[in-house]
């Protein structure tokens, strides 16, 4: 849990912005969204494999684009 100490003469908006940023860095909202509904382990594995495959395809496409000549 991110803890923010409000500095002297610091406005509420600035302190709230700092708190939101620290929550974002800690990944709290992403964790809450992922745990909102139960997801079967097979579904989790399937989703992770799909993201891995997409990332790999993107990397290969970048490599191929770098190796092709533009003339």
Swiss-Prot record:
Gene3D superfamilies: Ribosomal protein S8. This is Small ribosomal subunit protein bS21. The gene is rpsU. GO terms for molecular function: structural constituent of ribosome. Residues 47-71 are annotated as: Disordered. GO terms for cellular component: ribonucleoprotein complex; ribosome. Pfam families: Ribosomal_S21 (PF01165). Residues 60-71 have a biased composition (Basic and acidic residues). It comes from Pasteurella multocida (strain Pm70). InterPro entries: Ribosomal_bS21 (IPR001911), Ribosomal_bS21_CS (IPR018278), Ribosomal_bS21_sf (IPR038380). It comes from the Bacteria. Keywords: Ribonucleoprotein, Ribosomal protein. PANTHER family: MITOCHONDRIAL 28S RIBOSOMAL PROTEIN S21, SMALL RIBOSOMAL SUBUNIT PROTEIN BS21. GO terms for biological process: translation. Belongs to the bacterial ribosomal protein bS21 family.
